[in-house]
Amino acid sequence: LADVDEETGNFVLAKALVAVRLDSKVSAGLKDDVVKIIGQAIGTENGANALAVGRNLAAYVIAADIIDLPKIRPDFDESVFRPWLRSFATRKFTGRTLRSCQEDRPNNWGTHCGASRIAIAAYFNDQMEMTQAASVFQGWLGDRRSYSGFKFGPEAFSWVSDVCLRSASSCQPVPVNPRGALVNGHNVDGVVVDDQRRTGEFTWPPKYTYYSYGGLGGAVVQAGILHRFGFDAWQWGDRALKRAVEWMYYDGDRKPKWDTCDDANKRYVLDVVDHAYGSNFIERMNCAPEASKPGRNIAWTSWTHQ
């Protein structure tokens, strides 16, 4: 879990998904593998930063849920796995808990921390924790009344819409720009400002950064889990997640289209967004879409989200 680029969680998720689709004899062996690997992962978070834990942990929690760990291994679930998950509520990783990371960082750090935070809340069916995390996510999608405590990098302010900047000298951005946002007359509707600022101050045409799809990778996992628990997350922020991908695809006014052809471990963002909105981003890719590769925190979505 301490390796920010580790992919083991994706393969644990694959074993869990295959296990629930096969006959009982083969399935039992795969489920045992999942439990074994989860056990081996415990403790590997020592020395990690919050981003690494945020990226890696969710897949293990989702895999445990898929195989119904409380039913097949109640002893391991109660005495090992659940106490470990509970520890993440207060444990600090380079000064941040998953909770404070989601609440402070309006970028890929925060979205991945939020995904693991929400996955844990879902596993425990902790409605209070999930509601609190959902409020932060709704704020991330643009509703400052829901939450507005994010700390932006200085360059992010140059990507904020002209309307906001004209309204007050103290204008505060929202992590995903609102519908119709413009900067100097250029379309920035849906820009994830604290990831796009990795390219520097506002410039046009804008430059590509893989941090934008990286941030959306954590966001779609948050939205997917929250939706399963009754939150209308895909509609929040005037369909902010769809608008964010639309801006990446926007190819007018000298801005090139940015899909995930050269960024395969972000392909799952397009699968999940298409599944949620009935959109066709996969069909609109510049390359022939391949089956989804291991992602930043989940994977195999070209199979699970058809």
Regions found by a protein language model. Name each.
Residues 1, 108, 302-306:
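N-terminal module-boundary/linker segments of secreted carbohydrate-active enzymes
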Residues 2-229:
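Aromatic-lined, polymer-binding surfaces characteristic
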Residues 207, 228, 233-306:
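CBM-like carbohydrate-recognition segments
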